[in-house]
């Protein structure tokens, strides 16, 4: 069973992916964790590292290739990241989670203990950089949701509600854990 969970910053993908992986007994691969770890190693904020990555395509390619290879090796996995739905071609279920930008900014501000105005500006900038990078490096339009099986507004549900919707989709699609 392979599930991808994607969405913009603050939409809840990391939280939801962790819970889904735990409930289904699957391994979790998170691009965001890798990206944040690399930013910290360089002594940069996520926004600074996003700008750095725009000028250094090897960063994105390293993260994306690593995530893709890890997902291909695993039979039972939840892959979380903005591009995971695009890179994990053989996923059984591809999920896109979104929320109103103000809801997302508020979540990020709370999570990171930052001022909402600062988060709003940083997140908009980050999303602009990422959108350009994805198009420039991969010809991916991140706003094209047609590749996803399931699209959920996390502003309308708490994390557990989003998880329940995903678990119901797994049940409806009759997706099973791969025993091989």
Swiss-Prot record:
Paired cysteines (S-S): none
GO molecular function, one term: CMP kinase activity
Protein name per the record: Cytidylate kinase
CDD domains cross-referenced by the UniProt entry: CMPK
Species annotation: Archaeoglobus fulgidus (strain ATCC 49558 / DSM 4304 / JCM 9628 / NBRC 100126 / VC-16)
Binding site for ATP: 7-15
Catalysed reactions, semicolon-separated: CMP + ATP = CDP + ADP; dCMP + ATP = dCDP + ADP
Keywords, alphabetical: ATP-binding, Cytoplasm, Kinase, Nucleotide-binding, Transferase
Lineage: Archaea, Methanobacteriati, Methanobacteriota, Archaeoglobi, Archaeoglobales
Gene3D superfamilies attached to this UniProt entry: P-loop containing nucleotide triphosphate hydrolases (3.40.50.300)
GO cellular component entries: cytoplasm
């Amino acid at each position: 069973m392979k599930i991808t969970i994607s969405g913009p910053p603050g939409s809840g993908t990391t939280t939801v992916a962790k819970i889904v992986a735990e409930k289904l007994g699957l391994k979790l691969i998170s691009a965001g964790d890798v990206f944040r770890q690399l930013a910290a190693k360089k002594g940069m904020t996520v926004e600074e590292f996003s700008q750095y990555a725009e000028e250094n395509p090897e960063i994105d390619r390293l993260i994306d290739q690593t995530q893709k290879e890890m997902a291909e090796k695993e039979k039972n996995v939840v892959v979380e990241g903005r591009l995971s739905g695009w890179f994990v071609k053989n996923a059984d279920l591809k999920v896109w989670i979104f929320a109103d930008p103000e809801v997302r900014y508020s979540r990020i501000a709370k999570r990171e203990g930052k001022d909402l105005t600062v988060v709003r500006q940083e997140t908009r900038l980050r999303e602009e950089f990422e959108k350009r990078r994805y198009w420039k490096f991969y010809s991916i339009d991140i706003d094209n949701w047609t590749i996803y099986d399931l699209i959920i507004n996390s502003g309308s549900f708490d994390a557990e509600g989003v998880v329940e919707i995903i678990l119901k989709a797994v049940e409806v699609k009759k997706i099973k854990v791969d025993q091989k």
